C-alpha cells in the first residue's frame, strides 16, 4: 500500500510547504501494512518526520483499520497523541457515541491512555458508495447537515474525511459539490 505520489514531486512538495507555512498540522496516515504489523508505525512516522522536518503527533489508520490493543500501544509508544480513525466506513455518525474526543482505554491493562480518539463524523465514500449508505446528493447533503447541526448543538468536534480523489472535476460523483457546499455552510456557523 504505497503512496501514489512522491514527496519529492513538485506539486506535493509545494502543498507540504504551503501547509507548514500556514501553520497547518500534518499527521501520519499509517499504511495498510502497519495495520497488520504495528511495529511499522514507528518507521513510517520517523520517515514522515524526516521529510516534513516536524514532529508528528496525529494519526489515522488506512481503511479505518485499527487492531486494538496492538495499534494503540504502538501509537502511544511512538509518540502519537491523537488518533482520527474512530469511525465506521458503512455509516456516518458517532461511532464513539459522542462528538467529543475521548481517551483510549487499554482493554487488556484497563489503563487510561494518553491517546485521544477523535470521532470521525463524515467520510465522503460512506455517503455515496452503494456498499455503504448509497445516498444521492440531496440525501447526503441533508444527512451531513443534520450531523453538523448535532455537533454544533453539543459543542463537539466535527471531523470530515474527504479523499483527494473526491475533489476531482469531471467525474460522475457528487462528492466535490457536496464538500464545497458543506464548507460554505461551516463558514457561516
Which residues fall in each region the model found?
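A general structural detector for well-ordered alpha-helical segments in enzyme core domains, enriched
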Residues: 11-15, 40-48, 71, 143, ...
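Metal-dependent polysaccharide deacetylase catalytic core of the NodB/CE4 family, i.e.
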Residues: 1-66, 164
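Short, glycine-/Ser/Thr-/acidic-enriched flexible segments
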Residues: 31-33, 89, 123-125, 165-167
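Histidine/acidic-residue-rich catalytic or RNA/ligand-binding cores of hydrolases
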Residues: 37-43, 68-74, 94-100, 170-180
Amino acid at each position: 500500500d504505497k503512496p501514489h505520489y512522491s514527496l519529492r514531486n513538485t506539486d506535493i512538495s509545494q502543498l507540504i510547504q504551503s501547509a507548514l507555512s500556514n501553520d497547518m498540522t500534518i499527521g501520519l496516515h499509517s499504511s495498510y501494512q502497519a495495520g497488520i504489523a504495528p511495529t511499522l508505525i514507528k518507521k513510517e512516522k520517523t520517515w514522515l518526520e524526516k521529510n516534513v522536518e516536524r514532529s508528528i503527533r496525529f494519526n489515522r489508520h488506512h481503511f479505518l483499520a485499527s487492531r486494538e490493543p496492538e495499534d494503540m500501544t504502538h501509537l502511544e509508544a511512538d509518540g502519537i497523541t491523537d488518533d482520527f480513525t474512530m469511525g465506521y466506513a458503512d455509516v456516518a455518525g458517532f461511532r464513539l457515541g459522542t462528538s467529543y474526543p475521548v481517551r483510549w482505554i487499554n482493554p487488556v491493562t484497563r489503563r487510561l491512555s494518553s491517546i485521544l480518539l477523535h470521532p470521525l463524523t463524515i467520510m465522503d465514500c460512506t455517503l455515496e458508495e452503494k456498499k455503504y449508505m448509497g445516498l444521492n446528493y440531496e440525501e447526503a447533503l441533508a444527512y451531513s447537515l443534520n450531523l453538523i447541526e448535532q455537533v454544533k448543538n453539543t459543542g463537539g468536534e466535527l471531523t470530515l474525511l474527504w479523499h483527494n480523489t473526491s475533489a476531482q472535476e469531471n467525474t460522475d460523483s457528487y462528492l466535490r459539490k457536496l464538500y464545497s457546499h458543506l464548507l460554505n455552510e461551516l463558514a457561516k456557523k
